[in-house]
Amino acid sequence: MIIEDLGIIDYVAAGELQRQRLEGVLAGTGPETLFILEHPPVVTLGLRGGAENLHVSEEYLRQHGIALVHCDRGGNITCHYPGQLVAYPIFKIQAKTGGIHRLFWCMEETVIRTAAHFGVVAERAEGRPGVWVGPRKLCSIGMGVKRGVTWHGLSMNVSKDTGLFDIITLCGLRGASATSLEK
């Protein structure tokens, strides 16, 4: 496995890199990879949709330099922005984790322990995916799996500026709000 820091990269461009690496892993010609990165401001809609959870027009997004992308990861609507740590594991899940649910648990546990390192008490919330600090979401997880290989991943809010989330109903969860390690 290799780890690649992509810096700040456009969501669509990162998706293409994921697809290329995914196809390499599936063909046995490329290494399993963990991409670490940030995205410029973007709102993404997963396979469960979420357009009804976007509270501004596409024109508003364009005027404010915020991209809108319909993507093939699991989950609903979320936002990405500089100051958010994004991790995309391109892993063979059966060999590494015993299945997607175990991988989700491991990813959540990594975020919980990372938050604890910075003095933030984070936890899982029954029936609400991701990692939470009280009633506020610290980390979202939305993945895709193709023939036993994962792609997409998690986003953990690090910077205290989580204002982009004000324009959506976070992950389609009424009443949910975002927090960050800095808050």
Feature locations, PLM:
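N-terminal lobe of the biotin/lipoate ligase/transferase fold
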Residues: 1-138
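Active-site donor-binding loop signature of nucleotide-sugar glycosyltransferases
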Residues: 8, 143, 183
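A short beta-strand motif that forms part of the nucleic acid-binding face
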Residues: 49, 145, 172
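Short, conserved beta-strand/beta-arch hydrophobic-aromatic motifs that form part
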Residues: 54-60, 138-162
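Short conserved catalytic/interaction loops centered on acidic-Pro-aromatic/His motifs
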Residues: 120-125, 151-152, 164-168
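A hydrophobic, small-residue-rich beta->alpha segment in the mid-to-C-terminal subdomain
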Residues: 163-183
